[in-house]
Amino acid sequence: MPLADNTIVLKSKDEIEKLRRANIVVAEILARLTDVIEPGVTGLELERICEGEIKKRKVEAAFKGYRGYPYCLCVSVNEMVVHGFPSKRTFREGDLVSIDFGVLLDGFYGDSAVTVPVGKISSDAARLVDTTRASLDRGIDAMRVGNRVQDISSAVQSEVEGAGFSVVRAFVGHGIGRNLHESPQVPNFGKPGKGMRLKEGMVLAIEPMVNAGGCDVKILDDGWTAVTTDGTLSAHFEHSVAVTRDGPYVLSRI
């Protein structure tokens, strides 16, 4: 998804706490959805639960209507990388279900994603999920004042490729604040020491998307759903994180 513009907006401590509140809501709703994922459940059921949580918490869905996207959730299963539509397809034992979700609360956005195993999954699928999660942690750890954007990128890439998997290059992380997508872009591949220098007050959504096979993706006829071109599994984790003088502050972690 395109960025709002090329301006880097540094956030005050008060603004970061407002972003924290929005991201806590995202994290709590994702936890609720994770708890109900099991064989036989559908993406549309998750969407209905999500709609109820949004109404109860008096927040706005960040994705629904954004550049025409028709749902509150992105639900991507197995070979789907990102932006999958919630559907009537039932989840089966061994599936990987990635949920990407965001809200708008008091003028600030929250955004996070998680990949959830359905029942017992294969050892290869489990290793993909674990590696993707670990790559996110590595990227977050690089979010320190004075480092550069591609220090984050390189940390993610080295974790992923060291495990024999591929980082998706067609989609990137991004700044977040009063807009869902702000500058800078944060690729999941790059060279240490390159890119914009990280400053206190930057808030970034770091989101490795990792394929078991090659890095290439294609878009389905719905115009949104991205899938691996080779049909292999994909996993996706995301946190919104603030750069502070004390290190990274993960806003979407509870």
Describe these PLM feature segments.
Residues 1-254:
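Active-site neighborhoods and metal-handling regions in enzymes and metal-associated proteins
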